[in-house]
Amino acid sequence: MNQHNLIKLTESPRDAQQGLPYVITPEKRAAYINALMKVGFDVIDFGSFVSPKAIPQMAEAGRVLSMVDKTGSKSKLMAIVGNLRGGSDAATQPKLDIIGFPYSTSETFLKKNINADAQQAEAIIDGLQQICAGNGKELRIFLSLAFGNPYNDAWDIDILSKHTEKLALKGITTVTLAD
């Protein structure tokens, strides 16, 4: 492995935009993504395929993607999904390379973020693996609350390791440790 493969940079305008108190138009979001495509990030986490009722800032993700120009860029595009419907919608997007899913060792996090318990979340991961395999997409799991748990659920490095191992045994090749 050479030095250029040691660090991969992911830029995430999605993370910032979804917390804004207003909605940025799809045209402006696409223009921003197009500017980022020229920078050379390894991955751009551009948006989410979720209900616009849940996160109105991420509405019309497919429309945003339709306006993104990948010509001459090595950057991969990633979207986050919270369920199988979002995964199915994302998988139909030809410009999308990676589908991300927020998983956690915390039952409270899972309930608040994807309205699922651990068993349901694992079933979603299984379904997303099939969706991704059938559509030529990479699946990336975000192991949220990897560095601690503000909800007072049990957390330690052994619990984190157990969940990471479980994901690896499922065949997940990319796990991002997230706060």
List PLM regions with ranges.
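N-terminal capping/small domains of soluble enzymes
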Residues: M1-L84
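N-terminal small/glycine-rich loop or linker at the start of catalytic domains
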Residues: M1-P21, F101-N113, G134-Y151
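Conserved, mostly hydrophobic/aromatic
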Residues: A16, L36, A90, I99, ...
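Glycine-rich anion/phosphate-binding loops
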Residues: V23-A30, M78-S88, N113-L128, A154-S161
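Glycine-enriched alpha-helix->loop->beta-strand junction motifs that scaffold or abut catalytic
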Residues: G40, T92-I99, L169-T173
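Glycine-rich, proline-tolerant flexible connector loops at the mouths of alpha/beta enzymes
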Residues: D42-M67, F101-A116, F147-Y151, T176-D179
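Alpha-helix-loop-beta-strand connector modules within alpha/beta enzyme cores
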Residues: A54-A79, Q120-I141, S161-E165
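Conserved C-terminal portion of the radical SAM core fold
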Residues: L139, L160-D179
